[in-house]
């Protein structure tokens, strides 16, 4: 059998579906739209903490930059020669030794000429 309240041709309005001014009838709290303010102090504290953290990080980066500027770091634009003349002067300052001085070096050497050649990554066992 059909429900008599639904058999009419006009749409029925059930009390649960009534919405007044954007709020359902069931809403018992008239201040529900202001409930977001309930945790406003916690929200403000969180935002303030994030701002302090950002400021701290910014200060750390600034201190790192100042520390780099204080030390004598290699700066290519400042430390490398700028002109070909400077490069040529550096080449002229280099001394090419003759082979006789190399032979003297070998004769005066304290190294063992019979030692095995060193190969990195290979372990040698004393047998």
Swiss-Prot record:
Stretch list, region Disordered: 1-24
Give the coiled coil ranges. Answer: none
Location relative to the cell = Cytoplasm
Q: Cite the GO molecular-function annotations of the record.
A: mRNA regulatory element binding translation repressor activity; translation repressor activity
Q: Does the keyword Ubl conjugation apply?
A: yes
Can you summarize the PTM annotation of this record?
A: Ubiquitinated, leading to its degradation by the proteasome.
* One record GO biological process: negative regulation of translational initiation
> How is this protein annotated for GO cellular component?
cytoplasm
Q: What are the start and end residues of every segment in region (PABPC1-interacting motif-2 (PAM2))?
A: 105-120
Q: Does the keyword NADP apply?
A: no
> Keywords of this protein's UniProt record, alphabetized?
Cytoplasm, Translation regulation, Ubl conjugation
Q: Give the top-rank taxon of the lineage listed in the UniProt record for this protein.
A: Eukaryota
Disulfides per UniProt: none
Stretches of Low complexity bias are at 1-15
- Region: PABPC1-interacting motif-1 (PAM1); residue ranges are 22-75
Its UniProt domain note says: Only the PABPC1-interacting motif-1 (PAM1) interferes with the binding of PABPC1 to poly(A) RNA and translation initiation.
Q: Which family does it belong to?
A: Belongs to the PAIP2 family.
Summary of the function given for this chain in its UniProt record: Acts as a repressor in the regulation of translation initiation of poly(A)-containing mRNAs. Its inhibitory activity on translation is mediated via its action on PABPC1. Displaces the interaction of PABPC1 with poly(A) RNA and competes with PAIP1 for binding to PABPC1. Its association with PABPC1 results in disruption of the cytoplasmic poly(A) RNP structure organization.
Task: Please give the name of this protein.
Answer: Polyadenylate-binding protein-interacting protein 2
Provide the species name: Gallus gallus
């Amino acid at each position: 059998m059909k429900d008599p309240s639904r058999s009419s041709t006009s749409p029925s309005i059930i009390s649960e579906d009534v919405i007044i001014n954007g709020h359902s009838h069931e809403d018992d709290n008239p201040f529900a739209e202001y409930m977001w303010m309930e945790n406003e102090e916690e929200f403000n504290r969180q935002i303030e903490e994030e701002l302090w953290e950002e400021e701290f990080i910014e200060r750390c980066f600034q201190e790192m930059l100042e520390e780099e500027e204080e030390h004598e770091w290699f700066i290519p634009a400042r430390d490398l020669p700028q002109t070909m003349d400077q490069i040529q002067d550096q080449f002229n300052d280099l001394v090419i030794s003759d082979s006789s001085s190399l032979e003297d070096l070998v004769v005066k050497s304290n190294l063992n000429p019979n030692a095995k050649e060193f190969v990195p990554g290979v372990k040698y066992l004393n047998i």
